[in-house]
Protein backbone atom coordinates (compact mmCIF):
# COMPACT_ATOMS: atom_id res chain seq x y z
CA UNK A 1 0.00 0.00 0.00
CA UNK A 2 1.27 3.47 -0.83
CA UNK A 3 1.30 5.80 2.16
CA UNK A 4 2.55 9.28 2.82
CA UNK A 5 5.87 9.09 4.63
CA UNK A 6 7.04 11.65 7.14
CA UNK A 7 10.42 12.27 5.57
CA UNK A 8 10.93 15.86 4.52
CA UNK A 9 12.51 17.13 1.33
CA UNK A 10 14.20 20.51 1.70
CA UNK A 11 15.44 22.56 -1.20
CA UNK A 12 18.26 24.72 0.09
CA UNK A 13 19.33 28.14 -1.06
CA UNK A 14 20.74 30.89 1.14
CA UNK A 15 18.47 33.88 1.64
CA UNK A 16 19.75 37.02 0.01
CA UNK A 17 20.42 40.28 1.79
CA UNK A 18 21.58 38.71 5.06
CA UNK A 19 25.25 39.54 4.79
CA UNK A 20 26.31 35.91 4.97
CA UNK A 21 29.10 34.49 2.86
CA UNK A 22 29.87 31.21 1.20
CA UNK A 23 32.77 28.94 2.03
CA UNK A 24 34.83 30.19 -0.92
CA UNK A 25 34.26 33.86 -0.09
CA UNK A 26 35.80 33.41 3.36
CA UNK A 27 38.93 32.02 1.74
CA UNK A 28 39.62 35.40 0.15
CA UNK A 29 39.92 36.93 3.62
CA UNK A 30 42.82 36.81 6.02
CA UNK A 31 41.02 35.76 9.16
CA UNK A 32 40.26 32.04 8.75
CA UNK A 33 43.28 31.19 10.86
CA UNK A 34 44.18 31.07 14.54
CA UNK A 35 42.35 29.45 17.46
CA UNK A 36 39.38 30.42 19.61
CA UNK A 37 36.84 28.89 21.98
CA UNK A 38 33.08 28.64 21.73
CA UNK A 39 30.67 27.64 24.52
CA UNK A 40 27.60 25.73 23.36
CA UNK A 41 24.49 24.37 25.04
CA UNK A 42 24.93 20.59 25.04
CA UNK A 43 21.67 20.15 23.14
CA UNK A 44 23.40 21.36 19.99
CA UNK A 45 26.61 19.35 20.29
CA UNK A 46 25.94 17.25 17.18
CA UNK A 47 25.51 20.38 15.10
CA UNK A 48 28.59 22.17 16.36
CA UNK A 49 30.86 19.12 16.11
CA UNK A 50 30.18 18.82 12.39
CA UNK A 51 30.33 22.58 11.77
CA UNK A 52 33.78 22.70 13.37
CA UNK A 53 35.06 19.61 11.58
CA UNK A 54 34.04 20.92 8.16
CA UNK A 55 35.26 24.46 8.90
CA UNK A 56 38.68 23.23 10.03
CA UNK A 57 38.90 20.94 7.00
CA UNK A 58 38.26 23.96 4.77
CA UNK A 59 40.66 26.20 6.70
CA UNK A 60 43.53 24.08 8.10
CA UNK A 61 45.05 27.04 9.95
CA UNK A 62 41.86 27.54 11.96
CA UNK A 63 41.07 25.84 15.26
CA UNK A 64 37.73 26.18 17.05
CA UNK A 65 37.71 24.65 20.54
CA UNK A 66 34.19 23.81 21.79
CA UNK A 67 32.99 23.54 25.38
CA UNK A 68 29.63 21.80 25.80
CA UNK A 69 27.91 23.14 28.88
CA UNK A 70 24.50 24.23 30.10
CA UNK A 71 22.99 27.28 28.46
CA UNK A 72 23.36 29.21 31.71
CA UNK A 73 27.08 28.43 31.90
CA UNK A 74 27.53 29.45 28.27
CA UNK A 75 25.85 32.81 28.86
CA UNK A 76 27.78 33.37 32.09
CA UNK A 77 31.06 32.66 30.26
CA UNK A 78 30.21 35.16 27.53
CA UNK A 79 29.29 37.84 30.06
CA UNK A 80 32.54 37.21 31.97
CA UNK A 81 34.55 37.49 28.72
CA UNK A 82 35.80 33.90 29.10
CA UNK A 83 34.72 33.24 25.52
CA UNK A 84 33.73 35.38 22.57
CA UNK A 85 31.12 33.06 21.07
CA UNK A 86 28.17 30.99 22.30
CA UNK A 87 25.32 28.95 20.83
CA UNK A 88 22.16 29.30 22.92
CA UNK A 89 18.39 29.71 22.58
CA UNK A 90 18.07 33.27 23.83
CA UNK A 91 19.26 36.63 22.62
CA UNK A 92 21.19 39.10 24.72
CA UNK A 93 19.16 41.78 26.41
CA UNK A 94 19.85 45.44 25.79
CA UNK A 95 21.42 45.64 29.24
CA UNK A 96 23.72 42.67 28.57
CA UNK A 97 24.90 44.18 25.30
CA UNK A 98 25.61 47.48 27.02
CA UNK A 99 27.51 45.71 29.82
CA UNK A 100 29.76 43.89 27.33
CA UNK A 101 30.40 47.14 25.49
CA UNK A 102 31.18 49.14 28.63
CA UNK A 103 33.09 46.48 30.60
CA UNK A 104 35.06 44.74 27.85
CA UNK A 105 34.70 47.00 24.79
CA UNK A 106 32.92 44.12 23.03
CA UNK A 107 30.23 44.62 20.40
CA UNK A 108 27.89 41.64 20.36
CA UNK A 109 26.58 40.22 17.09
CA UNK A 110 23.66 37.82 17.22
CA UNK A 111 22.17 35.70 14.44
CA UNK A 112 19.43 33.09 14.50
CA UNK A 113 20.93 29.97 12.91
CA UNK A 114 18.16 27.39 13.34
CA UNK A 115 14.73 26.54 14.68
CA UNK A 116 14.99 23.57 17.03
CA UNK A 117 12.28 21.41 18.55
CA UNK A 118 12.15 19.82 21.98
CA UNK A 119 11.21 16.15 21.68
CA UNK A 120 9.82 13.68 24.19
CA UNK A 121 11.09 10.15 23.65
CA UNK A 122 10.29 6.74 25.12
CA UNK A 123 11.61 3.22 24.73
CA UNK A 124 10.61 1.82 21.33
CA UNK A 125 8.64 -0.97 23.06
CA UNK A 126 6.55 1.50 25.05
CA UNK A 127 2.86 1.45 23.96
CA UNK A 128 2.43 5.23 24.30
CA UNK A 129 2.54 7.03 20.93
CA UNK A 130 1.40 10.58 21.69
CA UNK A 131 0.94 13.17 24.42
CA UNK A 132 -1.04 16.39 24.62
CA UNK A 133 0.35 19.68 25.83
CA UNK A 134 -1.81 19.23 28.94
CA UNK A 135 -0.20 15.82 29.53
CA UNK A 136 3.24 17.41 29.40
CA UNK A 137 2.18 20.14 31.81
CA UNK A 138 0.84 17.55 34.27
CA UNK A 139 4.01 15.46 33.91
CA UNK A 140 6.24 18.40 34.71
CA UNK A 141 4.05 19.52 37.62
CA UNK A 142 4.03 16.03 39.15
CA UNK A 143 0.31 15.36 38.60
CA UNK A 144 1.08 12.40 36.33
CA UNK A 145 3.42 9.83 37.87
CA UNK A 146 2.20 6.47 36.51
CA UNK A 147 1.81 5.10 32.99
CA UNK A 148 -1.90 4.30 33.42
CA UNK A 149 -2.53 8.03 33.75
CA UNK A 150 -1.41 8.31 30.13
CA UNK A 151 -3.92 5.78 28.75
CA UNK A 152 -1.60 2.80 29.20
CA UNK A 153 -2.66 -0.18 31.31
CA UNK A 154 0.63 -0.38 33.20
CA UNK A 155 0.43 0.97 36.76
CA UNK A 156 4.22 1.20 37.04
CA UNK A 157 5.70 4.55 38.04
CA UNK A 158 7.35 6.45 35.23
CA UNK A 159 10.51 8.54 35.34
CA UNK A 160 11.20 11.78 33.54
CA UNK A 161 14.82 12.26 32.46
CA UNK A 162 16.32 15.44 31.08
CA UNK A 163 19.75 16.96 30.59
CA UNK A 164 21.58 19.12 33.09
CA UNK A 165 20.12 21.86 35.26
CA UNK A 166 20.49 25.21 33.51
CA UNK A 167 20.20 23.73 30.02
CA UNK A 168 18.14 25.43 27.32
CA UNK A 169 15.73 22.47 27.24
CA UNK A 170 15.02 22.67 30.97
CA UNK A 171 14.60 26.46 30.80
CA UNK A 172 12.24 26.18 27.83
CA UNK A 173 9.94 23.64 29.47
CA UNK A 174 10.03 25.42 32.84
CA UNK A 175 9.06 28.76 31.31
CA UNK A 176 6.37 27.21 29.12
CA UNK A 177 4.66 24.89 31.59
CA UNK A 178 5.52 25.71 35.20
CA UNK A 179 4.37 28.57 37.42
CA UNK A 180 6.92 31.22 38.34
CA UNK A 181 9.42 30.04 40.92
CA UNK A 182 8.84 26.33 40.38
CA UNK A 183 11.58 24.06 39.01
CA UNK A 184 11.41 20.78 37.11
CA UNK A 185 13.82 19.35 39.67
CA UNK A 186 11.12 19.86 42.34
CA UNK A 187 9.27 16.97 40.70
CA UNK A 188 10.03 13.66 42.45
CA UNK A 189 9.88 11.67 39.18
CA UNK A 190 12.28 14.02 37.34
CA UNK A 191 15.99 13.23 37.18
CA UNK A 192 18.75 15.35 35.67
CA UNK A 193 21.53 13.73 33.65
CA UNK A 194 24.89 15.12 32.57
CA UNK A 195 23.94 15.63 28.93
CA UNK A 196 21.60 14.69 26.08
CA UNK A 197 23.59 11.57 25.23
CA UNK A 198 22.82 10.12 28.67
CA UNK A 199 19.12 10.92 28.26
CA UNK A 200 19.07 9.06 24.94
CA UNK A 201 20.91 6.03 26.35
CA UNK A 202 18.63 5.75 29.39
CA UNK A 203 15.48 5.79 27.27
CA UNK A 204 16.92 3.13 24.95
CA UNK A 205 17.36 0.82 27.95
CA UNK A 206 14.55 1.77 30.34
CA UNK A 207 10.93 1.11 29.26
CA UNK A 208 9.65 3.30 32.12
CA UNK A 209 11.54 6.46 31.17
CA UNK A 210 10.35 9.50 29.26
CA UNK A 211 13.25 11.55 27.95
CA UNK A 212 13.33 15.23 27.04
CA UNK A 213 15.86 16.00 24.33
CA UNK A 214 16.70 18.34 21.46
CA UNK A 215 15.60 17.00 18.07
CA UNK A 216 19.12 17.68 16.79
CA UNK A 217 20.14 14.55 18.72
CA UNK A 218 17.62 12.42 16.84
CA UNK A 219 18.48 12.99 13.18
CA UNK A 220 19.85 9.99 11.27
CA UNK A 221 21.23 11.90 8.30
CA UNK A 222 24.15 13.59 10.04
CA UNK A 223 25.30 10.34 11.61
CA UNK A 224 25.26 8.71 8.19
CA UNK A 225 27.12 11.65 6.67
CA UNK A 226 29.93 11.26 9.20
CA UNK A 227 30.68 7.81 7.74
CA UNK A 228 31.54 9.38 4.38
CA UNK A 229 35.11 10.62 3.67
CA UNK A 230 35.48 14.33 4.33
CA UNK A 231 36.24 15.27 0.71
CA UNK A 232 32.97 13.64 -0.39
CA UNK A 233 31.04 15.25 2.46
CA UNK A 234 32.47 18.63 1.50
CA UNK A 235 31.41 18.22 -2.13
CA UNK A 236 27.90 17.33 -0.99
CA UNK A 237 27.70 20.27 1.40
CA UNK A 238 28.80 22.71 -1.31
CA UNK A 239 26.28 21.39 -3.85
CA UNK A 240 23.65 24.13 -4.07
CA UNK A 241 21.32 22.26 -6.42
CA UNK A 242 20.52 19.13 -4.44
CA UNK A 243 17.94 18.51 -1.77
CA UNK A 244 18.06 17.16 1.75
CA UNK A 245 15.85 14.38 3.04
CA UNK A 246 15.64 14.45 6.82
CA UNK A 247 14.81 11.31 8.79
CA UNK A 248 14.73 10.72 12.53
CA UNK A 249 16.15 7.78 14.46
CA UNK A 250 14.19 4.59 15.11
CA UNK A 251 16.33 3.56 18.11
CA UNK A 252 13.75 5.19 20.39
CA UNK A 253 10.12 6.14 19.91
CA UNK A 254 9.59 9.85 19.33
CA UNK A 255 6.23 10.92 20.72
CA UNK A 256 3.76 12.94 18.73
CA UNK A 257 2.37 16.02 20.46
CA UNK A 258 -1.12 17.52 20.18
CA UNK A 259 -2.14 21.00 21.19
CA UNK A 260 -5.91 21.05 21.80
CA UNK A 261 -7.65 24.38 21.22
CA UNK A 262 -11.28 25.50 21.23
CA UNK A 263 -11.40 24.77 17.49
CA UNK A 264 -9.93 21.24 17.60
CA UNK A 265 -10.67 20.15 21.17
CA UNK A 266 -12.68 17.07 20.14
CA UNK A 267 -10.19 15.72 17.61
CA UNK A 268 -6.77 17.38 17.95
CA UNK A 269 -4.09 16.17 15.57
CA UNK A 270 -0.80 14.97 17.03
CA UNK A 271 2.43 15.89 15.27
CA UNK A 272 5.92 14.44 15.43
CA UNK A 273 8.89 16.86 15.42
CA UNK A 274 9.68 16.49 11.73
CA UNK A 275 11.01 19.50 9.85
CA UNK A 276 7.74 19.93 7.94
CA UNK A 277 5.85 20.39 11.21
CA UNK A 278 8.54 22.50 12.86
CA UNK A 279 8.44 24.74 9.77
CA UNK A 280 4.64 25.04 9.83
CA UNK A 281 4.41 25.47 13.60
CA UNK A 282 2.10 22.46 13.93
CA UNK A 283 4.60 20.81 16.25
CA UNK A 284 4.16 23.04 19.30
CA UNK A 285 7.50 22.66 21.14
CA UNK A 286 9.95 24.72 19.13
CA UNK A 287 12.44 27.53 19.79
CA UNK A 288 15.05 29.53 17.92
CA UNK A 289 18.78 28.86 18.21
CA UNK A 290 21.21 31.78 18.19
CA UNK A 291 24.91 32.16 17.63
CA UNK A 292 26.26 35.16 19.52
CA UNK A 293 29.76 36.51 19.00
CA UNK A 294 31.67 39.40 20.53
CA UNK A 295 34.75 38.78 18.38
CA UNK A 296 36.14 41.46 16.11
CA UNK A 297 36.04 41.07 12.33
CA UNK A 298 39.75 40.22 12.40
CA UNK A 299 39.20 37.18 14.63
CA UNK A 300 38.85 33.57 13.43
CA UNK A 301 35.51 33.45 15.25
CA UNK A 302 34.13 36.02 12.84
CA UNK A 303 34.99 33.71 9.95
CA UNK A 304 33.37 30.79 11.76
CA UNK A 305 30.29 32.91 12.53
CA UNK A 306 30.05 33.74 8.82
CA UNK A 307 30.53 30.08 7.89
CA UNK A 308 27.74 28.80 10.16
CA UNK A 309 25.25 31.33 8.79
CA UNK A 310 26.33 30.66 5.19
CA UNK A 311 25.14 27.95 2.80
CA UNK A 312 27.41 25.10 3.91
CA UNK A 313 26.84 25.77 7.61
CA UNK A 314 23.09 25.90 7.11
CA UNK A 315 23.08 22.70 5.08
CA UNK A 316 24.87 20.91 7.91
CA UNK A 317 22.11 22.04 10.27
CA UNK A 318 19.45 20.67 7.92
CA UNK A 319 20.93 17.18 8.30
CA UNK A 320 20.35 17.15 12.07
CA UNK A 321 16.56 17.14 11.80
CA UNK A 322 15.96 20.75 12.86
CA UNK A 323 15.28 23.70 10.56
CA UNK A 324 18.16 25.83 9.26
CA UNK A 325 17.16 29.48 9.54
CA UNK A 326 18.93 31.14 6.61
CA UNK A 327 17.58 29.13 3.71
CA UNK A 328 14.61 29.24 1.42
CA UNK A 329 12.65 26.15 2.36
CA UNK A 330 10.50 24.08 0.04
CA UNK A 331 9.13 21.31 2.20
CA UNK A 332 7.08 18.41 0.86
CA UNK A 333 5.99 15.07 2.26
CA UNK A 334 7.45 12.15 0.34
CA UNK A 335 5.41 9.16 -0.75
CA UNK A 336 6.91 5.86 0.31
CA UNK A 337 5.74 2.32 -0.29
CA UNK A 338 4.90 0.54 2.94
CA UNK A 339 2.89 -2.56 3.67
Region locations from a protein language model:
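Bacterial Sec-dependent N-terminal signal peptides
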Residues: 1-36
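A generic, residue-level signal for flexible/boundary positions that often mark functional hotspots
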Residues: 86, 107, 122-125
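Pocket-flanking alpha-helical
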Residues: 71-104, 218-221
Amino acid sequence: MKKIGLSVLISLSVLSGLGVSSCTEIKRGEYAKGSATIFCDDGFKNILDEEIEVFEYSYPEASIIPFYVSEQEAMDSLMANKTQAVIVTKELTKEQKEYLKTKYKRIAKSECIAVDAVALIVNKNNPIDALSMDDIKDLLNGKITRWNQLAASDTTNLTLVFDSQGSSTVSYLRDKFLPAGKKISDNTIAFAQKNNAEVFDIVKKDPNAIGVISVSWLGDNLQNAKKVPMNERMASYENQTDTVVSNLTTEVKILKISNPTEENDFSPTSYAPYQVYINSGDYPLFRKVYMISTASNSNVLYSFYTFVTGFVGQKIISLTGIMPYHVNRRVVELQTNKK
